[in-house]
Each structure stands twice: as structure tokens, then as C-alpha cells.
Amino acid sequence: MSRIGNKIITMPAGVELKNDNNVVTVKGPKGELTREFNKNIEIKVEGTEITVSRPNDSKEMKTIHGTTRALLNNMVQGVSEGFKKELEMKGVGYRAQLQGNKLVLSVGKSHQDEVEAPEGITFTVATPTTIAVEGISKELVGQTAAYIRSLRSPEPYKGKGIRYVGEYVRLKEGKTGK
């Protein structure tokens, strides 16, 4: 099993962690995140280092231990650096534009799709075919980017649709003629 839970998390300068009965609040230059963790897991802060420990070596505790450490690390990284997912659109007439905090997508449907930015998420449209989703919560950034991609996933014959930057879409061969 992975030993990720035993790794020590180092807090960068300007990041502050408060643990109140396993409800952890992490404050940093980009914002503040709060999350409740399992009562059996112990979270200690010593200077700029955070250690996560478990009471026993049962299979359940080992999994919760690793997950807790990974979530805490993502919180610390989010409030100090933030997270960003970039999407690109391929297809004739496919484009995106911002209207306030709404993302308006034209993706070959009879209507335009509008995506409201959840709290803590910002959209950036550098070119009409590239979208950047940014925020401090890795979970929320990933969910929002996945939702935008799901509005028109890449199809397997021409590759038209919304995809992550750098995502490889395997293309199928078309029908062979007579």
C-alpha cells in the first residue's frame, strides 16, 4: 500500500493552518479553505511542517490516512499557488466568450450553453477557442472543467469537441467504401 500519508507537508511562507477538532482551515495569499476530516486521524502543526498520523494500521485507517494527507496538501497548495485547468475547442464555429462571470459556449448546438462560474472559480478566455478554469480548490476546478468538457466531449471520428490542453483523442477510421 502507498505510504503517501507518512510524507510531511511543508507550508510555504504566508500560509496559516488552524485545526479545531479536525475541522481544518487553511489561510493563504489566494484565499481560505475549510474542510472536516475523520476524527480518528491526528493532524499536528510544528512550525512550517504538517504531519498526519493514524491510531492503528487497519486497512480503513491506512486509506483515510493517505487521503487526508493528500487533501491537506491540495489545500495548502491551493491557497498559496492555486490550480488551473485549460481546455481547448476543436470544430468549425466552436467558440467561447465571457459575459460577466458566465461562460457562453457555441458548440454546434441549436442554442448556446451558459456556464455560471461557481463561487471561488474564475474563467479566462485567451482566444475564442481556449478556456482556462482557475481557483483555489483543486476539487472544484476539476469538477467545473469536467462539466465544461462534458457539454461537447471530443467525438472519435474527427476529434471535434472540447478537450483538455494536451489530451490525446484516439481517432477511429471511418467506413470503407465499396
From Swiss-Prot:
Coiled-coil ranges (or none): none
GO function term, MF aspect, one: rRNA binding
Record-level GO cellular component terms: cytosolic large ribosomal subunit
Gene3D superfamilies hit by this protein: Ribosomal protein L6, alpha-beta domain
Key words of the record: Ribonucleoprotein, Ribosomal protein, RNA-binding, rRNA-binding
Family membership: Belongs to the universal ribosomal protein uL6 family.
Role summary: This protein binds to the 23S rRNA, and is important in its secondary structure. It is located near the subunit interface in the base of the L7/L12 stalk, and near the tRNA binding site of the peptidyltransferase center.
Protein name in the entry: Large ribosomal subunit protein uL6
